[in-house]
Regions:
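The feature marks the mature, well-folded catalytic cores of soluble enzymes
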Residues: 1-186
Length: 186
């Protein structure tokens, strides 16, 4: 986990269509999000969201944070905000343990997905991620793990590239230092 991997991650993530921005702290991240997400925003209740009072920070910036079962949000939410477990620099991929349905919905329903990443969680490649993936799957319960590389895109039947057809049109990765170095925590 070095700056070398952070630079590679930024380069590749941008190449696959993500916006990557270094922000000073979570307050600055909330401000950034408020400049883009003007409507209802989904923020799943995760250990890191609770630990860092993410919902309160976003609400203080004027963001309409939906609380509850995201299936009942009532209309298409504009934004979704999540933390990640770790990233893989060589593909610009963000990895989230998404067994909780609200996490999955926050990453797929909105037009814009914001992912908060501690740069210490950027691994070199998928081989470096094997120990974390192994630990993630320990235990008897199956888990859902999402690999997100850029905004949603498809070129189905007619081979015409469409952005945002099966998920967010935009992916914003916000690099924030000192959030968490625990690869199991999101």
């Amino acid at each position: 986990m070095t700056v070398k991997y952070q630079e590679l991650f930024i380069e590749i993530a941008k190449r696959v269509g993500a916006e990557v921005t270094q922000v000073e702290n979570l307050q600055a991240a909330a401000k950034y999000i408020s400049n883009i997400s003007k409507g209802t925003t989904l923020v799943p209740e995760t250990p890191l969201a609770t630990k860092h009072s993410l919902r309160s920070l976003l609400t203080a910036e004027g963001i309409d944070v939906f609380i509850g079962d995201f299936r009942k949000a009532g209309h298409m939410p504009e934004g979704g905000v999540t933390f990640c477990n770790f990233c893989m620099a060589d593909s610009g991929t963000v990895v989230l343990e998404s067994t909780d349905e609200n996490i999955r919905l926050a990453t797929t329903l909105p037009e814009t997905h914001f992912v908060i990443v501690d740069p210490e969680k950027i691994l070199e490649d998928n081989l470096a991620a094997v120990p974390a993936m192994t630990a993630m799957h320990e235990g008897s319960e199956p888990r859902f793990v999402a690999y997100i590389t850029g905004p949603s895109r498809t070129a189905d039947v007619e081979r015409v590239l469409t952005i945002g057809c099966h998920g967010p049109r935009e992916l914003h990765i916000l690099l924030v230092n000192n959030i968490s170095t625990d690869l199991m925590e999101n």
